[in-house]
């Protein structure tokens, strides 16, 4: 049993809304593998429910086992109990920035006698 992990950005093209007994829910359909250049193989897409906090434009990682289900002449692939996580991408292209402020309020060093120290 293989686990497939796919990262994609939720957008109008790959996300749809369906009505369920618990209200409207979003479903994302993501390619399960990349198509090789020049290949005539059709890419299979897997679908998963998105948590309510995922919005269009968010980048998500969907991971889980995929199950095939025949529906007439088509085969639908669905993630079974997937893990869906939002990927946090910073808009800052630079490396981690160091704190530029003085964390100690700009105070001068204090001289302490060694007799006053507890150790």
Curated annotation (Swiss-Prot):
Keyword DNA-binding present in the record's keywords: the answer is: yes
Q: Which UniProt keywords apply?
A: DNA-binding, Early protein
According to the UniProt entry, where is the signal peptide?
A: none
Work out whether the entry's keyword set contains DNA-binding. Answer: yes
Q: A single Gene Ontology molecular function, please?
A: DNA binding
Give the residue ranges for region: Disordered.
Answer: 96-119
Q: Which InterPro entries match?
A: Lacto_phage_SSB_sf, Phage_SSB
Its quaternary organisation is:
Homodimer; two homodimers can further weakly assemble into a homotetramer.
Entry similarity comment: Belongs to the skunalikevirus SSB protein family.
What does this gene product do?
A: Binds ssDNA with nanomolar affinity but no sequence specificity.
Q: What is this protein called?
A: SSB protein
Species of origin: Lactococcus phage SK1 (Lactococcus lactis bacteriophage SK1)
User: Source taxonomy lineage?
Assistant: Viruses, Duplodnaviria, Heunggongvirae, Uroviricota, Caudoviricetes
